Each structure stands twice: as structure tokens, then as C-alpha cells.
Amino acid sequence: MPHSYDYDAIVIGSGPGGEGAAMGLVKQGARVAVIERYQNVGGGCTHWGTIPSKALRHAVSRIIEFNQNPLYSDHSRLLRSSFADILNHADNVINQQTRMRQGFYERNHCEILQGNARFVDEHTLALDCPDGSVETLTAEKFVIACGSRPYHPTDVDFTHPRIYDSDSILSMHHEPRHVLIYGAGVIGCEYASIFRGMDVKVDLINTRDRLLAFLDQEMSDSLSYHFWNSGVVIRHNEEYEKIEGCDDGVIMHLKSGKKLKADCLLYANGRTGNTDSLALQNIGLETDSRGQLKVNSMYQTAQPHVYAVGDVIGYPSLASAAYDQGRIAAQALVKGEATAHLIEDIPTGIYTIPEISSVGKTEQQLTTMKVPYEVGRAQFKHLARAQIVGMNVGTLKILFHRETKEILGIHCFGERAAEIIHIGQAIMEQKGGGNTIEYFVNTTFNYPTMAEAYRVAALNGLNRLF
């Protein structure tokens, strides 16, 4: 006789990956429960990561825009806002997102259970509830979408009131005048922009030789120059020897012999998967040193009835990709295989001030691959719309094949870059000869718009051909 389970599938985590999986499963008629350890749905993306940091960035960006606008230059005082005030704006956005996502589950009759899950055996979970009770749940299949958390090295005292990670920084109650940021990855660079935009001194400690080395080098160099021009002090190829907290701040001793002191430290150097409390050993699964699971193309782990999506499987660690991974895993879970697959060229959005966004290959990759490419560029300062709204800092770069005119990569630096990139991405994804830079020359754009940058860049690139 077939075994009777409480659910067809249990999803652990309600972030983008868990939500994508849960919605995909219930739409296919499965009985689904979602387990969330926090009191509200949404996961780290909604409560500690993407949403609050982007809401903070938006508020700071508007303050900068106001202070730099010549319309208000006669005002004797600059517009300023405290970190607490800006956090209130982020809280408002978080609440809206939480209510909306809670509605998704309610409308689709998907059960939400609060507590910490751990595996008892291959088809059984123990749920440690907030009231101290323990429930036992069974399911035929599982989706692990429990996300990640900031990496905490053992020699850094994160209990000190002036030492923060990218989660706890959202609970900061004092107004720093000087911030140390250790780790110049995406999170470190975004918070460097936010704090510098609030006129806080920033020291950005980079353990590598350049910022965001995965980007096209021109984009990385543009960010470095913009940071330098705004007063951010970047220290490349540095690692800490010791971090000590004191009453009025934090002192960082670097292996190079330097010492730095600031009002507080944001440690933003890596993340680790939230798998340590799942008792994965009870179902024969192992994680790597960063708590991440290995999966196949259908997001199955070494146990075929257990799937994993999102940050817990590592690259690309993007909310957008996690949702799609969940949706694909749901299809594979129900039908045995997935016809959908994650797209090859996933766009990257980095919400510094200004933004950076990329899709496709970089110049360095194409040069290494010996692909005959050409470059088309458009400077924002030459666009009427950019001049109107005062967004003169920025550039759009299109890389295309010299012979076939196929678009190979698009890179954008400037305000709204993460929006602008999708116009080019849509053309890059076209099949049957539809991917060509000539599209931007032969179509008509609204005027004045930022989208016009594509026509300008296309003409610039095609004019280089001979």
C-alpha cells in the first residue's frame, strides 16, 4: 500500500526560493506546507537583505538628489536625515511586502507553519514551535529553501554593540560619523554608498585587488572612481589581524601593520547557509564548509526526494534567480522532470549609488575567448532625459560580434541601470536571428528617455565597423 503522508511536499523557508516552490506546487494541485522560523513570511530577502537595503538606498539617493539640485541651491541648509528616520522608511516597505506575500499563501490555501524544522528521518520533520511544543510532520518530498546568514568568523565579537553584520546593521540606534566596512563585495559596496550618501566617513576594506572583480573592468573602475570622488577610502589587498571593540568604537588591526579606528564596524565578508539546525545527517546529506548543498539541474540533492534552492545552494545567490529555481524545482518535483531551466545570462543588479547592472559577457571574457567583438557606448550626459532629471553620471556599453552583430554583453553604470539593462536583455534572449544590435537602430524610442541610450550606443558601435 502507498504510504500516507501529511503533505505532498513541505517547503522549508518562505524567501523567494521557498515562495517560488510553494506557489509552483499549489498551482499543480499539491498539498503543501511552508515552514518559516520567523514570525512573518518573506525570508531574509524581505526582512534583512534586498528590500530594506534597497529602501535605505532609495531614501539616501533622494536626499543626495535634493542637495545637488540647483533648484534648491539657494537654501542655506542641506537636507539631512538620521539613520533611524531612513530605517522607518524601510520598515514601511517591509510591512507592505509582508502583507502582500502573506496574501499569496492565503489565496492559494498554502499552510504556513512557524517554527524551526529539523529532519527526523527521510520523510519526517520535527517542528520546534514558538510556544515550546514539538510537532511531527511527514511529507513525500521536501524543498530546502532556508536561505543564508552573514558569515561570522569565531575571532570577531558580534555581541559588541559597535560590531554589526548586514542583518544587525538594520537595528543600529546610534548615528555614526565614521564607519569601517570589512568586505568589498556587493553588500559592502552598497552600504558604503548608503553611509557616504549620509555624509558618514567610510573606510572600505577590500580583501582583493579590485572592487567586484566579476564585473566588466570598466564598470568596476567606474565604481572605484566614484567612491574615490565621493570620499570613500578604499584599502585593497588587506586582511584583518585582530578586531577589538572599545567603548567609543572599534579598532581594526590589519595584517599589513595598519590600524584603523571608527565609530562602528560592518563586517560584510561572506555568507553561510542556514543548514546547521536541519539535522541533515539524519537523511544522509552533507553540506560544504559554507553550509551549502550540491544539487543537479533539477535542484535535487543527493537524496532524490529532497530539493534545494536559493542561497543554500550558492551561486548565483540572487533573489530573482531563487524564485525561478523554486518554480523549476516545483515542476520537477511533481512531474519528475522540468522543462523550464534557469536562463544562461542572468542579469546582475548592484544597488550602489549610482547603480551597476550587467548581463552577458564582459570584455575580459570575450578577449580570453578570442571572440571578435566591438563596443558601442552611450554617455548619460548626452541624453536629453538625463539632462532634464540631473542624472548625468553614467554610461551604457554594448558588446557585439563584429561579423554577426549578435549582442554578447551589456553593461550599465548610472541611476536606473538595473531597469535599463532589461531592454537589452530582452533582445539578447531572442532566437532565430532576433538578437542583433541593429534592432536598436531600426526601432523608434520614446523621446526623451533613458532607453534612448541603446540607440546612441548602437550607432556608436556600428560606426566602428569597417
UniProtKB/Swiss-Prot annotation:
<dbReference type="InterPro" id="IPR004099">
    <property type="entry name" value="Pyr_nucl-diS_OxRdtase_dimer"/>
</dbReference>
<dbReference type="GO" id="GO:0050660">
    <property type="term" value="F:flavin adenine dinucleotide binding"/>
</dbReference>
<dbReference type="GO" id="GO:0006739">
    <property type="term" value="P:NADP metabolic process"/>
</dbReference>
<keyword id="KW-0963">Cytoplasm</keyword>
<dbReference type="Pfam" id="PF07992">
    <property type="entry name" value="Pyr_redox_2"/>
</dbReference>
<feature type="binding site">
    <location>
        <begin position="36"/>
        <end position="45"/>
    </location>
    <ligand>
        <name>FAD</name>
    </ligand>
</feature>
<dbReference type="InterPro" id="IPR016156">
    <property type="entry name" value="FAD/NAD-linked_Rdtase_dimer_sf"/>
</dbReference>
<keyword id="KW-0274">FAD</keyword>
<dbReference type="InterPro" id="IPR001100">
    <property type="entry name" value="Pyr_nuc-diS_OxRdtase"/>
</dbReference>
<dbReference type="GO" id="GO:0006103">
    <property type="term" value="P:2-oxoglutarate metabolic process"/>
</dbReference>
<dbReference type="InterPro" id="IPR022962">
    <property type="entry name" value="STH_gammaproteobact"/>
</dbReference>
<dbReference type="GO" id="GO:0003957">
    <property type="term" value="F:NAD(P)+ transhydrogenase (Si-specific) activity"/>
</dbReference>
<keyword id="KW-0520">NAD</keyword>
<dbReference type="GO" id="GO:0005829">
    <property type="term" value="C:cytosol"/>
</dbReference>
<dbReference type="InterPro" id="IPR023753">
    <property type="entry name" value="FAD/NAD-binding_dom"/>
</dbReference>
<comment type="similarity">
    <text>Belongs to the class-I pyridine nucleotide-disulfide oxidoreductase family.</text>
</comment>
<dbReference type="InterPro" id="IPR050151">
    <property type="entry name" value="Class-I_Pyr_Nuc-Dis_Oxidored"/>
</dbReference>
<protein>
    <recommendedName>
        <fullName>Soluble pyridine nucleotide transhydrogenase</fullName>
        <ecNumber>1.6.1.1</ecNumber>
    </recommendedName>
</protein>
<keyword id="KW-0285">Flavoprotein</keyword>
<keyword id="KW-0521">NADP</keyword>
<comment type="function">
    <text>Conversion of NADPH, generated by peripheral catabolic pathways, to NADH, which can enter the respiratory chain for energy generation.</text>
</comment>
<dbReference type="GO" id="GO:0004148">
    <property type="term" value="F:dihydrolipoyl dehydrogenase (NADH) activity"/>
</dbReference>
<dbReference type="Pfam" id="PF02852">
    <property type="entry name" value="Pyr_redox_dim"/>
</dbReference>
<dbReference type="InterPro" id="IPR036188">
    <property type="entry name" value="FAD/NAD-bd_sf"/>
</dbReference>
<keyword id="KW-0560">Oxidoreductase</keyword>
